[in-house]
């Protein structure tokens, strides 16, 4: 309900506790990073459904053993930039694998629910990670504590 200067949640029904992440310290750190990025982008009184769906689907993807955490992180970072309206598109001046270009377009254009339906080669993952990192530094003008922890763990 709405208070004088804030909203109060009086009840919630939790449907997914992500029990797989309870024993996965690295996965939990990724989840904390996703929450920290969402906190960076989300503003009170805005419709942030897409960002919340992105965080939820990303946590589900962390629980899928077939998807490398680095791929989940890269997709999350790129899609967060897309959702926020800052995505500059595929870097045309760079020589990239055709599969990387396809993956970047897929991430930008797909619904959040369909994001985590593919895997990529190690080379494509390296290119996606590099581009996501460059875009993160360009559009997210702060450091994230959970990302610093992840860098020491991985």
Segments (PLM) and residue ranges:
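Non-catalytic alpha-helical scaffolds and adjoining flexible linkers that form interface surfaces
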Residues: 1-154
């Amino acid at each position: 309900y709405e208070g004088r200067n804030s909203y109060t949640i009086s009840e919630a029904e939790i449907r997914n506790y992500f029990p797989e992440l309870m024993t996965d310290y690295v996965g939990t750190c990724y989840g904390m990073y996703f929450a920290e990025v969402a906190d960076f982008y989300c503003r009170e009184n805005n419709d942030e459904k897409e960002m919340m769906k992105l965080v939820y689907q990303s946590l589900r993807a962390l629980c899928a053993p077939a998807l490398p955490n680095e791929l989940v992180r890269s997709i999350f970072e790129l899609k967060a930039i897309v959702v926020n309206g800052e995505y500059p598109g595929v870097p045309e001046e760079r020589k990239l694998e055709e599969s990387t270009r396809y993956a970047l377009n897929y991430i930008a254009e797909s619904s959040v629910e369909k994001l985590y339906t593919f895997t990529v080669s190690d080379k494509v993952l390296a290119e996606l990670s590099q581009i996501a990192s460059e875009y993160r530094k360009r559009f997210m003008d702060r450091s994230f504590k959970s990302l610093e922890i992840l860098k020491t763990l991985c």
